[in-house]
Design a protein with these regions (language model features):
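Sec-dependent signal peptide cleavage junction
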Residues: 19-35
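Short, loop-centered acidic/histidine patches that primarily coordinate divalent metals
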Residues: 104, 326-329, 377-380
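Sec-dependent N-terminal signal peptides of Gram-positive bacterial secreted proteins and lipoproteins
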Residues: 4-24
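Low-complexity, Pro/Thr/Ser/Gly/Ala-rich linker/spacer regions in secreted
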Residues: 33-48, 426-439
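Active-site mouth of glycoside hydrolases
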Residues: 39-273
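A short acidic, often aromatic-flanked loop/helix-cap motif at beta-alpha or helix-coil junctions
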Residues: 66, 299-301, 382-384
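Extracellular glycoside hydrolase catalytic/binding regions
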Residues: 71, 79, 192-372, 390-394, ...
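Aromatic-rich peripheral "rim/lid" segments of glycoside hydrolase catalytic domains that contact
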Residues: 174-175, 179-186, 335-344, 348-439
Length: 439
């Protein structure tokens, strides 16, 4: 009798365990099926760079694609062989597979012919050397109209109210003019002088970008708008509507990756309620081949940077889209007072730096959360006063108009970090492509 009871109990436990395993398998399969933009059929995160790893790359700046409307031409000379030499140098590494190429809408308005020609040069040269390109619709301090000294982004014709948007009145999140303008942008009330709304105008501009480069094998995808400003807690869902509008429009022309960006400011104690749930509201309705980009300029070991990284990871899970660290580096910030007398945090160039240990730690943290890709800031012909923002030095030859591009120690630090974290010596079997045949 006792033996029968024991047998019966064992049978019940076995049946319960079997049901649990079956149900868990069904649940996991359904979860993976509903998240095919992040997970493959085996439930693993998509990673499409080298050997199934995340995309590893750099940010790159151009010339005509970054000229502001309200300032003179860039003082640093632009070498005629900039793209040829840059992509060739990048292709000779074992780890760099893409660039995040930033451009500005107002630069297109300033000189559309030169702008488009430069984009075509980028795409053709990237094709030649087997480097992928993400085309990033960038903005910094809103526009050179609002921030004449440093801003670049939206074209001047979208600031046609001289009372609300006085030229030079400030484009940072602390600026009253910027707050008003961005609020109206999310309400879709920003219009040109002929009455066309800003969203439609930007849609037309982005379609020109896609039409120019989408046919190229090197084109990886497009970033809708880098780091838009949020000023009130009701704007999160409005940004979601904006991203949905842009994604739906661009999907008529391309099936390639589309990226939407984090907001600024990222103040975890702000009244705009920066939390994972609100960040997830920015995602578009159509999440097929969609990626969420954020920036991180610090070591996410503890404190604010660690909390920030956790925030974006949580937002990614809620939204059901993978993460792209579109900008990463390490900087020191100090409190300063802006033109309106408000406290802001600015990069202190002399105190900013990144060591090999720092870079390895940052990349290791990114690997730990299972990202789609990352890009170091930055590769540029313009000399930056922040030393670790310079991946290359350029020796310009006035006689020929060309330049000799020499990677700096920071390029070596970045590539070694990628290599140390993602490539073990015994596992480094690289694919055969155009990069492996270069001299």
């Amino acid at each position: 009798m006792k033996t029968r009871s024991i047998s019966f109990i064992v049978l019940c436990i076995t049946l319960i365990a079997s049901c649990f395993i079956i149900n868990k398998g069904i649940f996991d399969a359904a979860y993976a099926q509903n998240n095919t933009n992040i997970f493959g059929t085996d439930g693993n995160k998509q990673s499409s760079g080298h050997e199934g790893l995340p995309y590893l790359g750099v940010n790159m700046r151009g010339y005509y694609t970054s000229l502001p409307q309200a300032r003179e031409d860039l003082k640093d000379p632009f070498p005629s062989n900039y793209y040829e030499s840059s992509f060739k140098t990048l292709s000779k590494t074992d780890v760099i597979d893409h660039v995040r190429y930033r451009f500005y809408w107002e630069s297109y308005v300033r000189d559309p012919v030169a702008f488009i020609k430069e984009l075509e040069d980028v795409a053709k040269t990237a094709d030649k050397y087997g480097i992928k390109v993400i085309y990033d619709n960038h903005q910094f301090h809103t526009s050179s109209w609002l921030n004449v000294g440093r801003g670049t982004g939206f074209p001047a014709y979208l600031f046609n109210d001289p009372v609300l948007y006085k030229q030079g009145s400030g484009g940072t999140p602390k600026s009253t003019a910027a707050e008003t303008w961005w609020t109206n942008w999310w309400n879709r009330t920003i219009k040109s002088v002929n009455g066309t709304d800003g969203w439609t105008l930007q849609e037309d501009f982005l379609k020109k970008i896609v039409s120019t480069v989408d046919k190229h094998q090197s084109t990886l995808g497009y970033e809708i708008l880098s780091e838009p400003q949020v000023h009130t807690k009701d704007q999160w869902t409005k940004i979601g509507k904006y991203n949905t509008f842009m994604v739906d429009a661009l999907r008529k022309l391309t099936s390639k990756t589309i990226i939407y960006s984090m907001n600024i400011p990222i103040d975890l104690k702000s009244p705009i309620q920066v939390n994972a749930e609100n960040l997830a509201k920015m995602s578009p309705n159509n999440k097929q081949n969609i990626v969420f980009k954020f920036s991180l300029y610090g070591i996410p070991n503890d404190g604010y940077q660690s909390d920030k990284l956790q925030l974006f990871e949580n937002a990614s899970r809620i939204a059901g889209v993978p993460l792209y660290i579109g900008e990463w580096n390490n900087v020191k910030r100090v409190a300063t007072i802006n033109e309106e007398g408000k406290k802001i945090w600015q990069i202190e160039a002399n105190q900013s730096n990144i060591s090999q240990a720092d870079a390895n730690m940052i990349v290791e943290k990114f690997k730990g959360i299972g990202i789609w890709g990352m890009a170091y800031w930055e590769w540029s012909f313009v000399i930056n006063e922040t030393p670790n923002f310079n991946l290359v030095d350029i020796m310009y030859d006035k006689a020929t108009g060309a330049g000799k591009i020499q990677p700096t120690k920071y390029f070596e630090i970045m590539t070694k970090a990628y290599q140390d974290v993602y490539y073990q010596p015994s596992e480094r079997v690289f694919p055969t492509d155009s990069r492996s045949t270069l001299s």
